[in-house]
């Protein structure tokens, strides 16, 4: 792996959230960043963050409401992995009237990262074959960073997240990074831990460096 230690501040000792400004979103830089607890946000210029505290999920403690559980059990949908990665990213970026950090540069760069086996999507299709929801993120070793989620059909994004968690647990993932908390992730059970603890857990989770290879359709 290419060494970018001269570009990024060391998050173990740097006490600010922005650890670098500029650079590019090349696969090599993204891989180094995620393995060291760093992620990009915005692209004019690119700002690289390592937040303290850090938002994470416990894979065994996703909060599922009774209403959502009924929808999951009704199975009026089809789940796939990595069938429509770029489409999922574009759907996550589609926020009429709002700004989005998922720009064309991010879409192009993460799609390339996906082709190399590090970025993944989960798609939730309705009974007519329409893409109703999905999630995308980055997987390295036993670590997954959830980047964004969308729902064009009510709760389909949450259904996708539920099945993503099931797949990650099956493959023995140990850390799910949600970066920062928002009202959706809070309601689903995300919580914060100190950066120091996050980096310790991350080091163990990414140690194998293996690529995740989920089946295209597993449910």
UniProtKB/Swiss-Prot annotation:
State one Pfam family annotation.
Answer: Leu_Phe_trans
Q: Where in the cell is it found?
A: Cytoplasm
What is this enzyme's class at the first EC digit?
A: transferase
Q: Supply the PANTHER family for this chain.
A: LEUCYL/PHENYLALANYL-TRNA--PROTEIN TRANSFERASE, LEUCYL_PHENYLALANYL-TRNA--PROTEIN TRANSFERASE
Record the organism: Leptospira borgpetersenii serovar Hardjo-bovis (strain JB197)
A GO BP term, please? protein catabolic process
Which EC number(s) does the record attach to this protein? 2.3.2.6
What are the UniProt keywords, alphabetically?
A: Acyltransferase, Cytoplasm, Transferase
Q: Write down the chemical reaction(s) this protein catalyses.
A: N-terminal L-lysyl-[protein] + L-leucyl-tRNA(Leu) = N-terminal L-leucyl-L-lysyl-[protein] + tRNA(Leu) + H(+); N-terminal L-arginyl-[protein] + L-leucyl-tRNA(Leu) = N-terminal L-leucyl-L-arginyl-[protein] + tRNA(Leu) + H(+); L-phenylalanyl-tRNA(Phe) + an N-terminal L-alpha-aminoacyl-[protein] = an N-terminal L-phenylalanyl-L-alpha-aminoacyl-[protein] + tRNA(Phe)
The record's Gene Ontology cellular component field reads:
cytoplasm
UniProt record similarity statement: Belongs to the L/F-transferase family.
* Listed name of the protein: Leucyl/phenylalanyl-tRNA--protein transferase
User: Which molecular-function annotations from GO does this UniProt entry contain?
Assistant: leucyl-tRNA--protein transferase activity
Q: What is its main location?
A: cytoplasm
- The disulfide bonds in this chain are none
Q: What is the lineage of its organism?
A: Bacteria, Pseudomonadati, Spirochaetota, Spirochaetia, Leptospirales
Look up the domain of life of the source: Bacteria
As for what it does, the entry says:
Functions in the N-end rule pathway of protein degradation where it conjugates Leu, Phe and, less efficiently, Met from aminoacyl-tRNAs to the N-termini of proteins containing an N-terminal arginine or lysine.
